[in-house]
From Swiss-Prot:
Span(s) of short sequence motif LD motif 2: 144-156
UniProt superkingdom: Eukaryota
Sequence ranges of Pro residues compositional bias: 45-54
GO biological process: endothelial cell migration; substrate adhesion-dependent cell spreading; transforming growth factor beta receptor signaling pathway
In-chain residues carrying the UniProt-annotated modification Phosphotyrosine: 31, 88, 118, 181
Gene Ontology cellular-component terms listed: cell cortex; cytoskeleton; focal adhesion
UniProt subunit comment: Binds to vinculin and to the SH3 domain of SRC. Interacts with GIT1, NUDT16L1/SDOS, PARVA, PARVB, SORBS1 and TGFB1I1. Component of cytoplasmic complexes, which also contain GIT1, ARHGEF6 and PAK1. Binds ASAP2. Interacts with RNF5 and PDCD10. Interacts with NEK3 and this interaction is prolactin-dependent. Interacts with PTK2/FAK1 and PTK2B/PYK2. Interacts with PTK6. Interacts with CD36. Interacts (via cytoplasmic domain) with CEACAM1; the interaction is phosphotyrosyl-dependent. Interacts with PXN; this complex stabilizes actin dynamics. Interacts with TRIM15.
UniProt feature, compositional bias: Basic and acidic residues: 289-300
Recorded coiled-coil stretches: none
Domain LIM zinc-binding: 356-415, 416-473, 474-533, 534-591
Residue window of motif LD motif 4: 265-276
Protein known as: Paxillin
Length: 591
């Protein structure tokens, strides 16, 4: 760098007396970017460095030996129109036409090597005007500067361990030799005589040494491409030699294209993450392309024809290729969406803190969480075990570690009413080994609800107290009403104590003795009366011997004559007006 600074200072002092008038270069000069419909591929290996010219060659009197070297390839002379201004000797940029098909062959099929033709202006000593002399002097100085820059560039690019002959040999070209064009140098605006053909020299940016101080654009692009994943290895293309303003413009354009491509790819990726369309997920399951992103194939340098030489290559993210198994279920689509979201967020470096593991799918929970039964759940996975509907914020019941919605739990596990067979949701009445709605537990006879006295059961049915005793309690033989408390059992019937009396006089039986006639209890008198066993004379029951006469029964001692009152024991008597008479009294009274 110190040598370069010294050379630049020497050049400035040498050319300080020259007019600052701008010099217009021809359409295609060593300091301009080549044009045409060719695809230019620059060679990363630096051109060979020629030996330094002698002092005579620099003064223009003796041709340098390198000037006598001509390439074996074809040469074409492109005549430039003469102009009134001095034209400096230059050569066109060496353009290598790269054919993609030619690169398929072996290296042996490649013909020739890249030719580097160096042009040094010939200074003819002639007694010409001073402007011509100054122009020639300026051209020689520029040529010397170009040579020194090339030498400096070769020293920087070639490792010190390589020999000079290896550094001077260029790599074989993929195709045929490229045509080179030479521009003849005019000595003066008036002579019109073309000087000897100048050898082509590789163009070199005059400000290359200064740019090497700063980080190169290629290194920045390499860092950018390494930070963005690419499906294929990036092809490194060295920047060609051109003038300083055009080189800066090309590298800036390359950086801008690469940066914009990476930005566009990132935007498309973020947009695809925000969409999460089901169609995209189905394509992921079928192995189709989900997203497409544009990645720069190379530096993105435009071709001389104005067309994008590098272009972009579509990079598609594809899922695992699996045979189609029919339309996926909504649950599987949702799981796929959640898994894709989690993986894509992790790839982008977005940290998601899991709030737990879902008790159903066993995956981490990043969004809303439901906590129930000592576990955490995705809201869409906390569903009823029976109907598979989301429980959400509704009430639920737990049985055997499984959640159930309120409706299914009552239908499956709640007790049933014996009357209506419906589930009992609130209060329950348990009776007769059954469960009942409170409003359905009533008397089977009258339909009245049971009060504090309770109910009575008969044949699996519940009855109120009144209906139960009326229907099933024993009845009193006297009043035919139910016997609820104390009772008397007699004559194969239950009796209220107050109802067990003589059926004729309704007198309670003294000492519990009674007489039965036709299934009814009687006192002794009414019993004998009912049976006809009373003495017609004394009106007392006949307990022993009796005499039956005139359809009546008499004690033997009470069967006497109605007039004389003598006992009729002889067995004969006369009857008159339902009264018995002896024979003597009947004759006396009625004869």
């Amino acid at each position: 760098m110190d040598d370069l600074d010294a050379l630049l200072a020497d050049l400035e002092s040498t050319t300080s007396h020259i007019s600052k008038r701008p010099v217009f270069l021809s359409e295609e000069t060593p300091y301009s970017y080549p044009t045409g419909n060719h695809t230019y591929q620059e060679i990363a290996v630096p051109p060979p460095v020629p030996p330094p010219p002698s002092s005579e060659a620099l003064n223009g009197t003796i041709l340098d030996p390198l000037d006598q070297w001509q390439p074996s390839g074809s040469r074409f002379i492109h005549q430039q129109p003469q102009s009134s201004s001095p034209v400096y000797g230059s050569s066109a940029k060496t353009s290598s036409v790269s054919n993609p098909q030619d690169g398929v062959g072996s290296p042996c099929s490649r013909v020739g090597e890249e030719e580097h033709v160096y042009s040094f202006p010939n200074k003819q000593k002639s007694a010409e005007s001073s402007p011509t002399v100054m122009s020639t002097s300026l051209g020689s100085n520029l040529s010397e500067l170009d040579r020194l820059l090339l030498e400096l560039n070769a020293v920087q690019h070639n490792p010190p361990g390589f020999p000079a002959d290896e550094a001077n040999s260029g790599p074989p070209l993929p195709g045929a030799l490229s045509p080179h064009y030479g521009v003849p140098e005019t000595n003066s605006p008036l002579g019109g005589k073309a000087g000897p053909l100048t050898k082509e020299k590789p163009k070199r940016n005059g400000g290359r040494g200064l740019e090497d101080v700063r980080p190169s654009v290629e290194s920045l692009l390499d860092e950018l491409e390494s930070s963005v994943p690419s499906p294929v290895p990036a092809i490194t293309v060295n920047q060609g030699e051109m003038s300083s303003p055009q080189r800066v413009t090309s590298t800036q354009q390359q950086t801008r294209i690469s940066a914009s491509s990476a930005t566009r790819e990132l935007d498309e990726l973020m947009a695809s993450l925000s969409d999460f369309r089901i169609q995209g997920l189905e394509q992921r399951a079928d192995g189709e392309r989900c997203w497409a992103a544009d990645w720069p194939r190379d530096g993105g340098r435009s071709s001389p024809g104005g067309q994008d030489e590098g272009g972009f290559m579509a990079q598609g993210k594809t899922g695992s290729s699996s045979p189609p198994g029919g339309p996926p279920k909504p649950g599987s689509q949702l799981d796929s969406m959640l898994g894709s979201l989690q993986s894509d967020l992790n790839k982008l470096g977005v940290a998601t803190v899991a709030k737990g593991v879902c008790g159903a799918c066993k995956k981490p929970i990043a969004g809303q969480v439901v906590t129930a039964m000592g576990k955490t759940w995705h809201p869409e996975h906390f569903v009823c075990t029976h109907c598979q509907e989301e429980i959400g914020s509704r009430n639920f019941f737990e049985r055997d570690g499984q959640p159930y919605c309120e409706k299914d739990y009552h239908n499956l596990f709640s007790p049933r009413c014996y009357y209506c067979n419906g589930p009992i949701l609130d209060k329950v009445v348990t009776a007769l080994d059954r469960t009942w709605h409170p409003e359905h537990f009533f008397c089977a006879q009258c339909g009245a609800f049971f009060g504090p006295e309770g109910f009575h059961e008969k044949d699996g049915k519940a009855y109120c107290r009144k209906d139960y005793f009326d229907m099933f309690a024993p009845k009193c033989g006297g009043c035919a009403r139910a016997i609820l408390e104390n009772y008397i059992s007699a004559l194969n019937t239950l009796w209220h104590p107050e109802c067990f009396v003589c059926r004729e006089c309704f007198t309670p039986f003294v000492n519990g003795s009674f007489f039965e006639h036709d299934g009814q209890p009687y006192c002794e008198v009414h019993y004998h009366e009912r049976r006809g066993s009373l003495c017609s004379g004394c009106q007392k029951p006949i307990t022993g011997r009796c005499i039956t006469a005139m359809a009546k029964k008499f004690h033997p001692e009470h069967f006497v004559c109605a007039f004389c009152l003598k006992q009729l024991n002889k067995g004969t008597f006369k009857e008159q007006n339902d009264k018995p008479y002896c024979q003597n009294c009947f004759l006396k009274l009625f004869c």
